């Protein structure tokens, strides 16, 4: 979809498409094969995954709540089960709200929990840089999703303890996590021409003994140069 089409979408339609990416596309892909394990090695099972994200904004438009960006994280190669969605510059649950950030916990295609920071400003600085870390972990028989170390000119610091959701789980490891699933389902959902870069910069894998490995391969989901 090109930038012109995205910029012409209504906010309601953009929200529908964002929700559609987590309720339709992954399920359509889930037949493709067995779960691909995440760095499961002799050191021990993976019980925590951290994804470092970077966003470079071009020229935002606060009047149209654009751009809107979403990242997704799940314990396996399917969204049939529990997973988390992180919305930036517009919360979609339970109804659309302008600006800010929102972490959502889903079960299949049903929303279960949400949490947000207290700053609901819309993105309004040109060339703004946003950084944050998405965390998924197993703690005390619970699957925990969290946003930490967030920074933004528009929103200030976020992910300082206020953005954490948890749910009981039968899982005792996260070996089924696959970064390709994250990148396939995370995207700039509205006004992509207002985003210069959206990149998953690195991934850290932890066992009960601590840090197992770090994947420093940058995964560029979106890149746009208005001069080209």
Regions found by a protein language model. Name each.
Residues 130-138, 143-145:
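Short tryptophan-centered beta-strand motifs in secreted/extracellular beta-sheet-rich domains
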Residues 41-110:
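Secretory/extracellular carbohydrate-interaction modules
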Residues 101, 111, 141-145:
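Hydrophobic residues embedded in beta-strands of well-ordered beta-sheets
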Residues 44, 96, 125-127, 138:
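Surface-exposed coil/turn segments at beta-strand junctions on protein surfaces, enriched
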Residues 142-168:
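Short helix-loop boundary/capping segments
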């Amino acid at each position: 979809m090109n930038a012109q089409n995205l910029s012409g979408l209504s906010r309601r339609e953009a929200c529908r498409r964002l929700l559609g990416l987590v309720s339709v596309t992954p399920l359509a892909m889930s037949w493709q094969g067995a779960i691909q394990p995440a760095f499961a090695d002799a050191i021990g099972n993976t019980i925590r995954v951290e994804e470092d994200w970077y966003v470079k904004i071009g020229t935002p438009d606060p009047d149209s709540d654009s751009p809107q960006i979403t990242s997704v994280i799940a314990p396996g190669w399917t969204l049939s089960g529990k997973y988390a969605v992180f919305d930036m510059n517009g919360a979609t649950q339970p109804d659309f709200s302008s600006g800010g950030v929102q972490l959502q916990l889903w079960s299949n295609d049903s929303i279960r929990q949400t949490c947000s920071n207290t700053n609901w400003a819309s993105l309004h600085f040109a060339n703004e840089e946003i950084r944050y870390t998405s965390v998924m972990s197993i703690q005390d028989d619970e699957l925990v999703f969290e946003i930490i170390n967030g920074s933004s000119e528009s929103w200030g610091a976020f992910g300082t303890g206020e953005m954490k959701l948890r749910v009981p789980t039968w899982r005792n490891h996260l070996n089924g996590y696959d970064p390709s699933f994250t990148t396939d389902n995370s995207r700039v959902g509205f006004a992509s021409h207002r985003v210069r870069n959206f990149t998953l910069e690195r991934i850290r894998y932890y066992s009960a003994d601590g840090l197992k490995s770090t994947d420093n391969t940058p995964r560029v989901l979106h890149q746009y140069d208005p001069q080209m």
